[in-house]
Amino acid sequence: LRCLVQYYADFVFKENEKLAETLKDIIDTPVSPELLPPDKDGKIAQKTENTVGSYILHDFFLYNCVRNGFSPEKIYFLAKIAVKQKNLEPFSDETIKNTLKIFYKRFFGQQFKRSCMPDGVKVGTVSLSPRGDWRMPSDSSVALWLKQVENLK
């Protein structure tokens, strides 16, 4: 939900100039696991978005999977329509499909982390807290969802 937080921060930029500079610096920093040291120019050498695909797509998939309970087919269909909107980046159908596959693999594969997550705030209408909105076994299999993604046309 990084994209949603960016929109909230943009609102704060307009309302509080003192916070704006600090928040802008934080938001403009690319998400990175920081496993690799910075390059010779001091720039981040490893950017997660380059590996997993667009965060815009991942946020779209997450919202429609968790909040709406949509199937991979419906999410793919809606994503193809949504990216045609003038305010979104253009993504090919193949890019959407590949990113959806990565999303499901990571979503299921990382469930164990959510099962023991610390308390935190809820931003928006979607929460993955195991104490509230989201309950999913850590050993769930992604096979059914990946099969649906593979069959997308």
What residue ranges belong to the model's regions?
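ATP/NTP-dependent adenylation/nucleotidyl-transfer catalytic domains that generate, transfer
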Residues: L1-K153
